[in-house]
């Protein structure tokens, strides 16, 4: 057996463009030798080796790194629905970007439901897994919610384990995603003067851009869902019509 990965290195002096993204590359190398390491252990090592021993730096950067993945998931495509990106860059939001070409059929959104049925009652994709995974993914009530819309077509009024409807979950997570980026930005700004100035400014610029981009994703996704379903956000937050 072996390991392989897709790594976004480039011509930047720090290789990864975003200084904090180097933690992923470090983690890949560490897992190649010790496969049982936890994300927290890897992150703690990388922070200490890269940014030093300052307790506030270690605490804040650890929080940022542990938040980054779930935060991105919150404000982009919900519950494993698939690509909702612009075809020209795979980065900006575009709900129907790939929906109507030969690579499409990711979300099949209607006024009442969303998702592609890949269960045994649909395309049968779930049956490519060995048991017990095949049965687990095949049923809505046992499929992990983080994978729900990849394997199933689900009504917007379906109630999740949180007690939210599916549609309200989409609204909530996209607002929460922006709030999480704001929190990460504040955590980094608290480190001014505690890390190398050039590193601080590069990461600050990236995080400010991420906040702008998260707001764009939030507004595009929530507006699309609202227009299709005509169901308002229960909390009355701003959704553009």
Regions found by a protein language model. Give the residues of each.
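Catalytic domains of carbohydrate-active enzymes that cleave complex glycans
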Residues: 1-241
């Amino acid at each position: 057996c072996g390991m392989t990965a897709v790594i976004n290195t480039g011509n930047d002096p720090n290789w990864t463009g975003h200084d904090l993204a180097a933690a992923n590359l470090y983690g890949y190398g560490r897992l190649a030798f010790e496969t049982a390491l936890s994300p927290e252990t890897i992150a703690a090592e990388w922070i200490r080796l890269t940014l030093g021993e300052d307790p506030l730096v270690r605490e804040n950067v650890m929080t940022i790194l542990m938040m980054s993945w779930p935060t991105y998931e919150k404000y982009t495509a919900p519950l494993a629905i698939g690509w909702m990106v612009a075809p020209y860059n795979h980065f900006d939001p575009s709900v129907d970007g790939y929906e109507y070409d030969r690579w499409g059929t990711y979300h099949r959104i209607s006024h009442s439901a969303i998702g592609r049925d890949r269960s045994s009652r649909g395309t049968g994709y779930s049956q490519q897994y060995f048991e017990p995974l095949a049965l687990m993914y095949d049923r809505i009530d046992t499929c992990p919610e983080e994978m729900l819309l990849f394997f199933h077509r689900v009504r917007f009024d379906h109630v999740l384990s949180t007690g939210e409807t599916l549609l309200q979950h989409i609204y909530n997570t996209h607002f929460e995603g922006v709030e999480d980026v704001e929190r990460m930005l504040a955590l980094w700004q608290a480190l001014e003067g505690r890390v190398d100035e050039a590193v601080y400014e590069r990461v600050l610029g990236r995080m400010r851009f991420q906040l702008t981009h998260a707001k764009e994703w939030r507004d595009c996704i929530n507006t699309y869902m609202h227009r299709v379903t005509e169901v308002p956000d229960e909390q009355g937050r701003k959704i553009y019509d």
